[in-house]
Amino acid sequence: TEPNDVLVAPDGSIFVGESHNAQFLDADGPGAIGRISKFSPDGKFIKTFGSFGYGPSQFRGPHSLAMDSKGRLFVADRGNRRIQIFDQEGKHLDTWYQFSRISGIYIDPNDVLYAIDSESDDNYNPGWRKGLRVGSARTGEVWSFVPEHVSTQPSGMGGYGSMGEGVAV
């Protein structure tokens, strides 16, 4: 499949978010894969959870993964414009919509959540702006927003401006 992100948990477990193209699909069918796969620290497959769709534990592009200090798995479900939160066995705990259409997510040791939105516009997410949202992984509160850098110089993909696809710390 098309892995989007890999996260290694504190115990060494490996989580993989799959599939990138599902964010562009509206219905189940060929290529409509949306799941998280879990592997042991030595790479042995343990389980998969999630499927393509719009409901809890369903994904349209699990694009980025992060883990908070409690060991909760945060999945940036970009095609559904939300974060879904799970325990490490795949039990759905919560869904947050206030961080927009996330391309990358990072949670620091103090549970500060950084979510980069590189795609919101009138086509992909009307009413939202590209940029970095910073908030609490404990409560879901968004504290601040840093808008995208707008440039008059063309970028490598032919557009204008600059916006991150992930979060590097």
Which residues fall in each region the model found?
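Eukaryotic scaffold repeat domains enriched in small/polar residues
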Residues: 1-169
